[in-house]
Amino acid sequence: LLKLGHDVRLIAPAYVKPFVKRQKNDAADAEAICEAAQRPSMRFVPVKTEEQQAAAMVFRGRDLLVRQRTQISNVLRGHMTEYGWIAPKGLVHLEKLAALLTDPSAVPQGVRSVCMLLLDSLAMLDRRHTELDKEIVRRSREDAVARRLMTIPGIGPITATAILALAPPPGTFAKGRDFAAWVGLTPRQHSTGGKQKLGSISKMGERTLRRLLIIGSSAVVLQASKRGAPKGSWPEQMMARKPRMLVTVALANKTARIVWALLTKNEDYTAPVAAAA
């Protein structure tokens, strides 16, 4: 449609739903879309380029492989538990179960054959997962913006490439807080009657980015708790008075704002200087 000269605008279905009257059909949907598109405050979804769609497909495929790998590992542990062989959570502990399956007397032959098939599927998923990880790392090394994003603490090749593939242009947001809100890292509001009430994070928007930012921030907070944060720094002050998970989410929010500033101003990341005691 863009090549034909049309002005294409995408609207999230959740914003169109309130304008649908009674029954759902093509005519009612078209009327609701026209009503929603004419609203001056309507938020439109930016159109992604083919390169962004291709990069996003890499992440969707990787997430699918991770979910399938987790499902198979859970099924394998569950089957072995029924015969008295218990393994903790985590793929690394499945090696013990794999070693047990080499012993014909450990479990019945029928169970052993099924579990060996599951282990073969896990090995195949691991190989494909590794291939996609290599592709993501290659993309991050070839992109100058991704290399600049990776200088931010808690952001590696996967998160940097995901930001470029899944996030809209930084100019879509007026400030860093708007970008953090789009990711779903700002408090959910329950305000009324002039009384402001904030709850947990909204968890709206792009959940893949939110998950990656929280995982990266969790690694930063864990390292700071073990090795100690710089005296007078923001993490050191927060960890002294707040739970670690709360600090992790707050750091993810802070990281999202830094990402927006980096993309908007085309600048390199500069570590903040700790305040003097």
Predicted feature descriptions by range:
Residues 1-277:
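A detector of single, family-specific signature residues
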